[in-house]
Design a protein with these regions (language model features):
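Cysteine-clustered segments with highest specificity for TGF-beta superfamily mature ligands
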Residues: 1-33, 119-187
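A short "linker-to-beta-strand initiation" element
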Residues: 21-73
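Hydrophobic residues positioned within well-ordered beta-strands of beta-sheet architectures
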Residues: 40, 92-94, 175, 189, ...
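A short beta-turn/strand-edge loop motif at beta-sheet boundaries
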Residues: 50, 85-88, 102-104, 220, ...
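Extended extracellular/luminal ectodomain segments enriched in beta-structured repeat modules
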Residues: 50-53, 83-94, 227
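Short beta-strands within extracellular/lumenal beta-sheet-rich domains
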Residues: 68-85
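Low-complexity, serine/threonine/proline/glycine-rich extracellular segments that form mucin-like
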Residues: 96-98, 104-110, 232-240
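Exported/extracytosolic protein signature
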Residues: 197-240
Length: 240
């Protein structure tokens, strides 16, 4: 919960988490050959008035995506938003966290509305590959320890490729996230989808005019001058 870390995370800096508990396991005689895993994530949603409005949906839970476990695919519906109208480009970001996505084992995939997602460091057939990546699709290298293979932990955020709005269309109100595998077993426990949406932004406008209708804002006036205040509203958002 946010309240656990609010008093600790008060400024920019380096924060270290330790002693995340996990039971001991052995891959040799464990039923699905995965052993045990543990990890943690801190997902922060912030407000920036300079950015376009977004619908942000987050899911926390736990699921096993496994061929041997009989659960090789999982569809997760996302709704409650409306994307921007045509012809504007639809922009979206996707954040995620999983356990046990092994680097050398292929077959794990992430799809959005039926389209495979990938980045330079996350191939479409080995998306969960024991790495920590950022919005630029490059690894996060200022970690400690800074191993290129986390041995079973994945977290990151990526820009959803959406050429010609072919993955997420204009005026869309829902999407489907699909996690699947044909080989590697992995355990997703968090994801979030942020989609640009239609949003008005009403700004109050105020103009001071003289008796002739001239704008006299910032000009000195004399005692007895007639002043007219013109109040209005201006929508600076993307909703008509």
């Amino acid at each position: 919960m946010t309240s656990i870390v609010t008093g600790l995370v008060t400024d920019l800096g380096t924060y270290t988490v330790a002693n995340v508990s996990s039971a001991q396991g052995r891959t040799r005689d464990f039923g699905n050959n995965t052993g045990h895993s543990a990890g943690w994530s801190l997902y922060i949603v912030y407000e920036d008035p300079a950015l376009q409005g977004k619908s942000i949906t987050s899911f926390d839970g736990f699921s096993a995506i496994s061929v041997s476990g009989g659960n090789a695919a999982l569809d997760i519906p996302v709704s409650g938003f409306r994307t921007v109208p045509s012809p504007a480009p639809v922009r979206a970001n996707f954040a995620f966290a999983t356990l046990e996505g092994d680097s050398p084992i292929l077959g794990d995939q992430l799809l959005l509305n039926g389209s495979n997602l990938s980045t330079a460091d996350r191939p479409s057939t080995n998306f969960f590959n024991s790495s920590v990546t950022q919005l630029s699709a490059l690894p996060v290298n200022n970690r400690n320890p800074n191993s290129t293979n986390t041995l079973g932990f994945d977290t990151g955020v990526m820009v959803v490729p959406n050429p010609a709005n072919s993955v997420i269309a204009n005026d869309a109100t829902s999407a489907t996230v699909r996690l699947e595998t044909s080989g590697d077993t992995y355990f997703p426990y968090f994801f979030s989808l942020a989609v640009d949406i239609i949003e008005p932004n009403i700004v109050l406008t105020k103009i001071v005019e003289d008796a002739l209708g001239n704008d006299i804002g910032g000009i000195l006036v004399n005692l007895g001058d007639e002043l007219n205040y013109v109040l209005g509203f201006n929508n600076t958002g993307n909703d008509d």
